[in-house]
A protein has these predicted regions:
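Minor-groove-contacting beta-hairpin "wing" of winged helix-turn-helix DNA-binding domains
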Residues: 11-18
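N-terminal helix-turn-helix
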Residues: 1-5
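Non-DNA-binding regulatory cores of transcription-related proteins
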Residues: 23-96, 100-102
């Protein structure tokens, strides 16, 4: 079972199941999580580094994967850092801009 931590109010969080999410629903959840947890986005080459608040990288990365974005090959998440591998350096700026627009 896959679960992610989501904000339910000021200082309040709960875990929600992410199995079976459509890309549209995943995008809405991802936007909320970016606003709540992402602190920085930087890119170089075909890689994007996303910094989150501690303990939230895995949940954000899981939703990025569920977006089924063809330009994104995959993600690797630690505690507060996500590495997004993009399909080619030329695609990175587009994907990074999409992530910035979620903030």
């Amino acid at each position: 079972m896959r679960a992610i931590r989501v904000r339910t109010g000021p200082g309040a969080f709960q875990y929600q199941i992410v199995e079976g999410l459509t890309p549209g629903v995943a995008r809405n959840k991802l936007k909320a999580m970016f606003r709540d947890f992402v602190t920085a986005i930087k890119g170089t080459g075909g890689l994007i580094l996303i910094k989150t608040t501690p303990g939230n990288a895995a949940g954000v990365a899981s939703l990025i994967d569920r977006m089924n974005e063809p330009k994104v090959l995959g993600t690797v998440a630690g505690d507060d850092t996500i590495l997004v591998v993009v399909d080619g350096e030329d695609q990175r700026a587009d994907v990074q801009r999409e992530f910035q627009n979620l903030l």
